[in-house]
């Protein structure tokens, strides 16, 4: 009977993961590539339990979605943000691996090259 219980537990886990992914899919932007979306969805799903909206509707989910966009925009588009905000999202994303990220040159790096 233990094998049957284990199989049921695995099926329940898989079902929960599927439901979470289906829930997150509604937040995908039409302009996101598959690579960008998979990374951002991992960010969202990782923190979703901590950012579920309470009954008073205080917008915790909106905050999580905004943080996920800050992280994705920084990673994939090279956008810059306030240091505290960037530190927060980078800490939240710790352990999420994204391959073949674009390389960006900052304005200050360009200015240093120009002055040399």
From Swiss-Prot:
InterPro entries: XTBD. Pfam families: XTBD (PF11952). Changing residue 81 to A: Abolishes binding to XRN2. The keyword Acetylation applies. Residues 24-116 form the XRN2-binding (XTBD) domain. Interacts with XRN2; the interaction is direct. Belongs to the CARF family. This is CDKN2AIP N-terminal-like protein. It comes from Homo sapiens (Human). The gene is CDKN2AIPNL.
